[in-house]
Amino acid sequence: MSQKTLFTKSALAVAVALISTQAWSAGFQLNEFSSSGLGRAYSGEGAIADDAGNVSRNPALITMFDRPTFSAGAVYIDPDVNISGTSPSGRSLKADNIAPTAWVPNMHFVAPINDQFGWGASITSNYGLATEFNDTYAGGSVGGTTDLETMNLNLSGAYRLNNAWSFGLGFNAVYARAKIERFAGDLGQLVAGQIMQSPAGQTQQGQALAATANGIDSNTKIAHLNGNQWGFGWNAGILYELDKNNRYALTYRSEVKIDFKGNYSSDLNRAFNNYGLPIPTATGGATQSGYLTLNLPEMWEVSGYNRVDPQWAIHYSLAYTSWSQFQQLKATSTSGDTLFQKHEGFKDAYRIALGTTYYYDDNWTFRTGIAFDDSPVPAQNRSISIPDQDRFWLSAGTTYAFNKDASVDVGVSYMHGQSVKINEGPYQFESEGKAWLFGTNFNYAF
């Protein structure tokens, strides 16, 4: 695995933390910004205004609130992602539960200024990913540890033009932190085999090099990359109210440009750099810098909410993410030399969701939803550190209102991912995944 390949995987992982659902929505986006939304598979989020969390999706919904409103909570993600396969060396590539559990917190506040204007703020984690393999895992050169976290700070405002039309605009500041580690696994054995099968294997020097490669311990850290950075963008929304029971929304989230500076190191001896081997560039434990610019894709969403009966409502969404903007990754050194330039060729992807809400009485509200997440990652670009796949959602939830001011939301979703094949480096894998998500939020109107 060359430094080009290593940097590509690391950069893509950083991109994942910022633009998209492996923390459980296809394309690596995190949808988990509220527990009420979780209970309806995030259907109709741009048009529903049942708590302050919806405003982080569509700022135009601020005009639906007549009192300052607060919401805070978290979603617990319990994934079950398993990898299987056999290395060319004969070692097993089986790894269970490679994605650890995680908490995704959220906090929202909305405040009307008058009948026409209002503002809101939120703290969410819109993107994230974590996969962990044992340090001695045979495929450690493409597995290892991938740990990515983000925090999104949003400030937005809204204007009501008349009884039908409202408009909202928001500013987003995204903080991202990434840590990537890769280990030798059985890569040394595979490299030694390649050398011995080549003309170099007939020479004393080549045989000595093969012996050295074959002696690399599985837990040797062949690459380490970490970094953090801020990125900025904006979002906007339009809300059309046909009447008090029927409303529709169009929302937009802009591209975000992220300029990363990361620290790269490898424990391999620098002597390996002289032979053009398929391993990361060796630094002998020293650290060097790498720079990466990512233009993260925009997202559009159309939503609707229809209260078809005093006790029943249906809601739906269609989201479209312009992943085709993500065509390549390019990293450079401090001197400006290209460290890698790799064609990614992502395709645009969509998410469709449908749900229903039952207003039982003044205290109890029940909701359900289903959704389908289309993966933007072409089969040839899948990775075990980012084992993306199409996903299906089944969701249910409830809200209990203590009084007219305070309420609590509870939501649960089950996600099922398709079984997929992954070809990465010299390895062939099969991956299957599913997840349970549990969320709760407390809401208060002042």
Curated annotation (Swiss-Prot):
Disulfide topology: none
Localization per Swiss-Prot or TrEMBL: Cell outer membrane
InterPro entries referenced in this protein's UniProt entry, alphabetically: OMPP1/FadL/TodX
Membrane topology: Multi-pass membrane protein
Major location (coarse): membrane
GO molecular function annotations of the record: ligand-gated channel activity; long-chain fatty acid transporting porin activity
GO cellular component entries: cell outer membrane
Alphabetical GO biological process terms: long-chain fatty acid transport
Keywords, in A-Z order: Cell outer membrane, Lipid transport, Membrane, Signal, Transmembrane, Transmembrane beta strand, Transport
Inducers of expression: By long-chain fatty acids. Expression of fadL is under the control of the FadR repressor.
Subunit structure: Has been isolated from outer membrane preparation as a homodimer.
Stated role: Involved in translocation of long-chain fatty acids across the outer membrane. It is a receptor for the bacteriophage T2. FadL may form a specific channel.
Protein known as: Long-chain fatty acid transport protein
Gene source species: Escherichia coli (strain K12)
High-level lineage: Bacteria, Pseudomonadati, Pseudomonadota, Gammaproteobacteria, Enterobacterales
